[in-house]
Amino acid sequence: MKKCINIEKIQKIGLFCRLNTNLNKQIDFLRAIFLQKNIELVLLEQEKINLKDLQELDFLISLGGDGTLLSLCRQAYQAKKPILGINAGNLGFLTALSFNEAESFFKDFFKNDFKIEKAKMLQITLYKKNKIIKKFAFNDAVFSRDNALMANVEVFFENKLFNAYYGDGLIIASSSGSTAYNISAGGPIVHPWSEIFVLTPVCSHSLTQRPIVLPYGFELELKVEHCLLYLDGQEVVDPKEYDKILIGLSKKELSFIHKKNRDYFQVLKEKLNWGK
């Protein structure tokens, strides 16, 4: 895909990580790489990113695991800056490379030898009296029961009842999020370039409920009982506080920096033992 980084003009790179973890050596290592190119490495405050500050940066680095990357995506999507995920955590499925690969990657990077891949986010629109609140999730929006009663999730499309789900809940996953909670609940693996989203029931009290794949442009209304809404597992929304909830794919896209030879199917094999 078309690159949106001018290598010759890079001046500042933002680094997002959990500062309470022992990553000082990794941070110093990255800073040394960029100093050789007269590039400043700017540490970003994890709890709250200032969008104005992001506008001065050429791209962003997430140093940590998938949770760190998700947190950056949800906070920085409005800045429209490319993101590079460097794994310093456990699984690191979403991150582009391990920390041990960083030095060799940046040698190629500064030769313009990399690629940009784009992915759409989920948009959650909440209505409360005269207010409209928009929230975004990169992986998934999950309705999960909040007590001993079964979750009741009714889904409407164009004001018609689409389906009703009874059980532990319902996962609404983006294509990128298909390999997260969705796959654990029996949902399909979806290539991240696909502009679709998936509805996967969790422990459905039915023998006939199956996951379904829906296209970009569909917007669903959800009416729920006995459950909470979790966005990327990092933010909790109580549906009872809102009059109406709509979910679909957003027009907003995130741009990710990857190695030029990255093979998605090889990542599936290495990280999830796919096909083995």
Curated annotation (Swiss-Prot):
The keyword Cell membrane does not apply. Keywords: ATP-binding, Cytoplasm, Kinase, NAD, NADP, Nucleotide-binding, Transferase. One of its GO terms (molecular function) is ATP binding. The keyword Cytoplasm applies. GO terms for cellular component: cytoplasm. Signal peptide: none annotated. Pfam families: NAD_kinase, NAD_kinase_C. NAD(+) binds at D66, G67, N139, D140, D168, T179, A180, Y181, N182, I183, S184, Q234. Gene3D superfamilies: Probable inorganic polyphosphate/atp-NAD kinase, domain 1, Probable inorganic polyphosphate/atp-NAD kinase, domain 2. InterPro entries: ATP-NAD_kinase_N, ATP-NAD_kinase_PpnK-typ_C, NAD/diacylglycerol_kinase_sf, NADK. It catalyses: NAD(+) + ATP = ADP + NADP(+) + H(+). The active site is at D66. Its cofactor is a divalent metal cation. GO terms for biological process: NAD metabolic process; NADP biosynthetic process. Belongs to the NAD kinase family. Involved in the regulation of the intracellular balance of NAD and NADP, and is a key enzyme in the biosynthesis of NADP. Catalyzes specifically the phosphorylation on 2'-hydroxyl of the adenosine moiety of NAD to yield NADP. This is NAD kinase. It comes from Campylobacter lari (strain RM2100 / D67 / ATCC BAA-1060).
